[in-house]
Structures are given as structure tokens and as C-alpha cells.
Amino acid sequence: MHIHSIKLPLVELKNINVVFEQKKALQNINLTLYPNSIITIVGPNGGGKSTLLKVLLKLLPPTSGQVIYHKNLRIGYVPQKIHLDHSLPITVERFLSLKKGISRQAIQDALSLLSISHLHKNSLQKLSGGEMQRVLLARAILNKPNLLVLDEPTQGVDINGQAELYQLIQQTQQQLNCAILMVSHDLNIVMADTNEVLCINQHICCAGTPETVSNDPTFIHFFGDQFAKNVALYTHKHNHKHDIHGDICCTSDFQSQQCTHKE
């Protein structure tokens, strides 16, 4: 059965907890990814966004909880950054060919889809930030994934190139008919196309569709009202709340006068 024929989940994360040296990095995370969906993860620095991606990518085992993968799942991953050894120059084509089991035609197709065929003989070390991100995206789609995981995909890209890169990501998603899970701080650009937004600060503080977020104070408290009309969320009950810096500002026993969160 083809993975897109019915709406079976691609990945399910159930009650994921991650603890580092008795400090909770993730707490009770539940997330289900379906075919063709676009989910954007936002949250303060140190809130656990990258940790969540590592758990999903099997780079980090959760302390507790379960990750369930569809048996035909293929994941493509674009990291936030990649370390290049400038003493060992390598061309774009050679870099892409390092991925096992990939044909030259698949490499050419990926470069063509991202409009960077002209870069195939260029040295990886001499690429601009935008060119490098396109190459990393090309590498991620070589196996024609049905889930594309992007960690800050516009890292190192100037502001003029960010909107163009996001448009390219959307076009790639449509061409491959894949789902996207993306960590991003460029909320004013990505929110228009995302199906769901998750705001994470160790736990899921808020989540939902972009159309229903406009006046919710929780998201505004984190990111400001300039993004509010593009993001949706729900609020949930727990025994603490966070201020704009991610610190606990009030509990069920003590309500800070400055806290704008709702029970």
C-alpha cells in the first residue's frame, strides 16, 4: 500500500520525555505527523526544539516515551549548519554522491528541482549561505522523502534570500508530496504556509492552526503581536507558566501580576 493512499500517520511521538543530568529538556511531548502536512516548531532558545528533532531522527533516545514510525517512512534532513573542512575541498556533485545508493540521475534531478544545476562543479567551501542551504536541501531530497525535517533552514541566508528559500521549500514539498516538520524563527515568512504551529518550551505550551491564533495572549507573550494574526494555538493546564524569556513566572499557588498566561 502506498504511504499516501490513506491518511495514516508518518510518525507518532507519544509522551516523550528527555532528561539531561536531572534537568528536563522535553516533558510529555505528543505529536503526530501526517502526509502532506507542514508543521512549524517555534519557541525560546533552549526550549527543546532541536532536542525534539534529534529524538524523531533517532539521534537521541528519549528518557521515556515512544516514537512510532510508518514502515515505509523515508526521512530527509536539513541540519541547522554543517562543518566543512576547508583543507579538503569538495565539489557539490561529489558531496551529494557521498550518500549511499544514490544515482547520478537522482543528483541531477535534485539539483534541477532546486535550480542549482549550474553549481554541480563548484567547491562547497566557496558557496554563499543561500547556495549552501539549497545544496543541503538537495541532499535531503535525494531519497525522495515523504517527511522532510528542517532545522532553521535559512541559517546563514541574508534576509533577501529567506523568502525565496521558503518558497522553494514549499515548491519542493508540492513536487515530492511530502510532509514537512520545520524549526524556524522566521515566523512572519513561514506562518502563511504552515498547517500547524507548535510552541515548545520543554513542553508544548501552545499549538494549533494559523487561522485561529490571532488574539491568544500566550503566543503573543512569546513573540509579540506582529505575528499573532498568522498563528494559532491552544492553551492547556499545567502547574506552571513561563515569561517571555522562558523562565517560570507563576504557578498554581502563586499568580504573578505580570503573567499574561491563562489557565
Curated annotation (Swiss-Prot):
GO cellular component annotations of the record: plasma membrane
Membrane-topology descriptor: Peripheral membrane protein
The reaction(s) this protein catalyses: Zn(2+)(out) + ATP(in) + H2O(in) = Zn(2+)(in) + ADP(in) + phosphate(in) + H(+)(in)
GO molecular function ontology, one term from the record: ABC-type zinc transporter activity
Chief localization: membrane
Domain ABC transporter: 11-226
Any GO BP: response to zinc ion
SUPFAM superfamilies xref list: P-loop containing nucleoside triphosphate hydrolases
UniProt-annotated location(s): Cell inner membrane
Amino-acid positions noted as binding ATP in the UniProt annotation, renumbered to this chain: G43, P44, N45, G46, G47, G48, K49, S50
InterPro entries: AAA+_ATPase, ABC_transporter-like_ATP-bd, ABC_transporter-like_CS, Metal_Ion_Import_ABC, P-loop_NTPase
Keywords: ATP-binding, Cell inner membrane, Cell membrane, Ion transport, Membrane, Nucleotide-binding, Translocase, Transport, Zinc, Zinc transport
EC numbers for this chain: 7.2.2.20
Subunit annotation: The complex is composed of two ATP-binding proteins (ZnuC), two transmembrane proteins (ZnuB) and a solute-binding protein (ZnuA).
Protein family membership: Belongs to the ABC transporter superfamily. Zinc importer (TC 3.A.1.15.5) family.
Function noted in UniProt: Part of the ABC transporter complex ZnuABC involved in zinc import. Responsible for energy coupling to the transport system.
Annotated protein name in UniProt: Zinc import ATP-binding protein ZnuC
Gene responsible for this protein: znuC
